[in-house]
Amino acid sequence: MTVLGHPRSWSCHCLPVLILLLGIGHGPRVEGVTHYKPGDPVILYVNKVGPYHNPQETYHYYQLPVCCPEKIRHKSLSLGEVLDGDRMAESLYEIRFRENVEKRILCHMQLSSAQVEQLRQAIEELYYFEFVVDDLPIRGFVGYMEESGFLPHSHKIGLWTHLDFHLEFHGDRIIFANVSVRDVKPHSLDGLRSDELLGLTHTYSVRWSETSVEHRSDRRRADDGGFFPRTLEIHWLSIINSMVLVFLLVGFVAVILMRVLRNDLARYNLDEETSSGGSSDDFDQGDNGWKIIHTDVFRFPPCRGLLCAVLGVGAQFLALGTGIIVMALLGMFNVHRHGAINSAAILLYALTCCISGYVSSHFYRQIGGERWVWNIILTTSLFSVPFFLTWSVVNSVHWANGSTQALPVTTILLLLTVWLLVGFPLTVIGGIFGKNNASPFDAPCRTKNIAREIPPQPCAISVELYYIFATVWGREQYTLYGILFFVFAILLSVGACISIALTYFQLSGEDYRWWWRSVLSVGSTGLFIFLYSVFYYARRSNMSGAVQTVEFFGYSLLTGYVFFLMLGTISFFSSLKFIRYIYVNLKMD
């Protein structure tokens, strides 16, 4: 009790510190906390710009030659906002609550040919900008490009020098914000000589209107003003197809496989009764199928420490994914709360480290593992080390290109502190509890000292094609978290059913090496997810450039690895439960 008392007390004091470190207090904002009086100033923050087709390639708005105050004042950001690439700063726009502005000059500029070329390149790459008004994002394109494929060929590039802001209010709160360039002619950037300066006058207007919508939760109006496409709607046909697939698989396992098992059990138990005069070994030599390997099926696998680490981290990500979806269902994530899902993911990852330590150490001790300290180190490194290596490469590329996605040094130190002071200690604490609470592995059958020779196995491949490619790399705003939770449950159910079926076929072939194969069979879905991401990049997206490419493939590989851990864990424990069931019901001497 003395050993466990100190970590438990330490963790209780550390949890509030973790919440403060992550900025939960000022990360997710409570809707409607800002109340205005007529004439009160409304601050407009400029945030970031970037290519429309490269969602993760963003730069600070003031990196472009635009109207900029003499002294840039940055807004204090939460951890989630920093991770999301936000770098908000005050602007020259003067907006007052419920006061319309017909046309006001923002600034006068004289651009050199190099600055004009920078704007031309940004417009050709379809750069968009993002402003923030009262925690509402406002997005629009930097300029306008017109290209004709007919003869004579034309290529015109123009810069939007006038922005029309439209804001809706209800009572003393801002409900909706948008920007448009309708009825505005872009300023041409063509035909400028290398030694010539381009004079520009940036202007803006503000229109206020009252709305009957009382809350920003009406996402049909408040999400993003329709700037990003909203193509992710409920595809009922896909949902029905998934349901039919699940019902077929469950029916296969529950009806067909159970009927086969009953026949096998009846035959094996009848043979056992009729052969009572001979020894068990003589009886085994005259039989075949999964019964004959009952003395080897619970033989512990090689690399048991690595197997337990995979199961522990997989269980952690199952809890993490479920927690994120449940929090989304509770309405904790929406477009107004910048980076809330990032902060929540870090918080949940740190807190669920105890799950990985407990599951890994508990099962490791059950199957006879003695080096539990090494098992804990392996468990805590199984995901964190690949993640750190991937992040280092991606962050270095962002830093070299001046992207806002590159994390500041202070944020890096904060995340490292969270892992060292919370994640790793909770893994150790969970490991201690798991080790101390572990009971001996209760195998229904005894295991021989000499392993049985495995006959030649037939070769087959089973691929479960399940499509749930997240919209992280696109521009859609996905809000159907109820459907996502349902589909997540379908994915786990399908993985469990396939694992049980493949394990039965493997045991029927007298191959008792099911431990690792049960993890790899369904866990290989992670490889498919990565291969699909390659197909998506090449055929379904318009991404380009080193920054976006490195980020896409780096985190796609990491995503496939996480799915391997989660589905491999579900697959293993489903197979273990199934094997216990069939051998418990088998009569043996």
From Swiss-Prot:
Residues with glycosylation annotation: N178, N401, N542
UniProt KW ATP-binding keyword: no
InterPro entries, A to Z: EMP70 (IPR004240)
Membrane topology, from the record: Multi-pass membrane protein
Subcellular location: Lysosome membrane; Cytoplasmic vesicle, Autophagosome membrane
Alphabetical UniProt keywords: Autophagy, Cytoplasmic vesicle, Glycoprotein, Lysosome, Membrane, Signal, Transmembrane, Transmembrane helix
Transmembrane region(s): 237-257, 310-330, 339-359, 373-393, 412-432, 482-502, 518-538, 552-572
Predominant place of localization: membrane
Family of this protein: Belongs to the nonaspanin (TM9SF) (TC 9.A.2) family.
UniProt function note: Plays an essential role in autophagy.
Protein name, entry field: Transmembrane 9 superfamily member 1
Organism in which the protein naturally occurs: Rattus norvegicus
Gene that this polypeptide is encoded by: Tm9sf1
